[in-house]
Structures are given as structure tokens and as C-alpha cells.
């Protein structure tokens, strides 16, 4: 059942707890759930890796939207990567203040052309942030990155990791769903936000999709491996045709995204 599935997710990703539900409809929904459940009015959200996905702009309130974090009095700060793709450590240090409650780190390049972050680099960034403010929550948007490397962000210090089952961990079989893994308190907060205070993870029909969640998760490493091989193959072909590709056919890969 769902309880065992969540224990499997927590164990595989090295987390204390997990929330894996079909009621989480997509990656953006999972991220919104994680943010809204762990931030309160007066808190500040910091992105030390530049602008997040376009879909998160309305969640945060960068673009005005009903129900955004901004509407609830949660502020947002952003530190862009340096031109060479490195972290702006000085800028990050200046941006962290007494209001900074949660730091969100987007692993994948997504729809941009900036470098995807390796788990090692994510760990270095988390260690730096924690050295300045140890109690800050470090959340990693792990979309497109699961099973690409042999370690995951939780194993290098992330307090919370979020992703979508219609990407890597669903193995192409999960028709819907998202996950949040990490510290027990963070996951519990998300569960109470998903359903209701006092109910949390105890309710919510699985609607017959649990088998596809298990099978997809079992197949996910193989499916991700195939996606990486296809991306490398496509990169080499388009390079030979004269196109600019990011990453190129020889670079180390930390997600399944290929830009042409």
C-alpha cells in the first residue's frame, strides 16, 4: 500500500520520511505544496541559483497570481549565478537574513541554458548556506535529476527534496503523482497542507495507481539510463550538423534535459 511505498521512497533517497501521492498532480504542485506548508507570513524564500521555472513565478508571486506566497506575506529574494555558472557566494551571504526561512535550489537547467547542478555542487552550496544560518530549510527541486547520479541531494544535506512521478521516478508508467521526501517535520507539514490539519497522511484514496507507482519506481533507473543514452546520441548528431547543444556529447550529465 501507500505506507510501504512511502517507506521505499524514503529509504531509496536516504530521507526520514516521504509523501508520495496521486493527489499531487505534477512537479509544480509538489513544489508549491512543499513551499506553502513550510513557510509562514513574514518568512522569506531565497533562490541562490537564479530564476526558477516559469511555472513557479506565479506560485512565488514574481508574477501576480491568486493564492501566491506573496499574497500571504512571504517575501522572495534571488541571487543569480555568476556569468561562468558558479555560485555567487558573496551575494548569497548578503541575501541571507533573519527572515530567511527556506532556500530553494533548482537542480535542473529546465528550460534555461545554465548548467545543471551536480549533487556534489548542491552539497557544497547547502554546506555554505548552513554555515551562515544552520536552521534554514534547504529544499532541492529534483525534477529531471532522479537516478542520474549514484547519490541524491538528501544524502548531501538537503532537508527536503521534491519531484514529479510523471518524470524520472515514475519510470514512464505513473500516470500522475508527485513526491516530497526529507526531514519528518517538513514532510508532515506538507501532508497536513495536502489534506487537512489533523489528517495528514492518513487519508486519500490511491485510485488504483499504486501498482504503477511501484513498477515505475522499480524501472526508473533503467528508463533514466535509456534517456541519458538517447540525449547523448542526439547531442552528438546535432553537433555534427552544426547546432549548438547544451550539454555537449562529452559533458558529465546531472539531469535528462538536452537543449538543441
Predicted region positions:
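Conserved N-terminal alpha-helix of the aminotransferase class I/II PLP-enzyme fold
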Residues: 1-27, 62
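Conserved PLP-enzyme active-site core in the AAT-like
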Residues: 25-225, 229, 235-238, 244-246
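Short glycine/threonine-rich loop-to-helix capping motif typified by GTGT followed
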Residues: 219, 258-260
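Conserved glycine-rich beta-strand-loop-beta hairpin in the small C-terminal domain of fold type I
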Residues: 250-258
